[in-house]
């Protein structure tokens, strides 16, 4: 299932952050889950679509697409 949300914060030096989902819990996002070529980073407040999978520490985003 594909969800949409906004980037709550993303630390490009460490390569991870969180996506805010309206009416739901924040979802962890790692730079390796961002689709596209080049430097993979997200900006605070940026809208994205993504899928959720169970990671080692709970739900995490995969197939993240910048909208």
Curated annotation (Swiss-Prot):
Keyword terms: Activator, Cytoplasm, DNA-binding, Transcription, Transcription regulation
Region forming the signal peptide: none
Pfam families, per the entry: CSD
Presence of keyword Nuclease: no
Transmembrane segments: none
Predominant subcellular localization, coarse grouping: cytoplasm
PROSITE patterns in the cross-refs: CSD_1, CSD_2
Annotated SMART domains: CSP
InterPro entries, A to Z: Cold_shock_CspA, Cold_shock_domain, CSD, CSD_CS, CSP_DNA-bd, NA-bd_OB-fold
Single GO molecular function: DNA binding
Gene3D superfamilies: 6.20.370.130, Nucleic acid-binding proteins
Assembly behavior: Homodimer.
GO cellular component: cytoplasm
All copies of domain CSD, residue ranges: 5-64
Role summary: Can bind to ATTGG and CCAAT motifs (Y-box motifs) of single-stranded oligonucleotides.
Gene of this entry: cspE
Subcellular location: Cytoplasm
Name listed for the protein in its UniProt record: Cold shock-like protein CspE
């Amino acid at each position: 299932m594909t969800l949409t949300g906004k980037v709550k914060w993303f630390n490009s030096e460490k390569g991870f952050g969180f996506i805010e989902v309206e009416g739901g819990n924040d979802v962890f996002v790692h730079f390796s889950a961002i689709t596209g070529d080049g430097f993979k980073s997200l900006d605070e407040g940026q809208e994205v679509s993504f899928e959720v999978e169970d990671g080692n520490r709970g739900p995490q985003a995969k197939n993240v697409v910048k909208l």
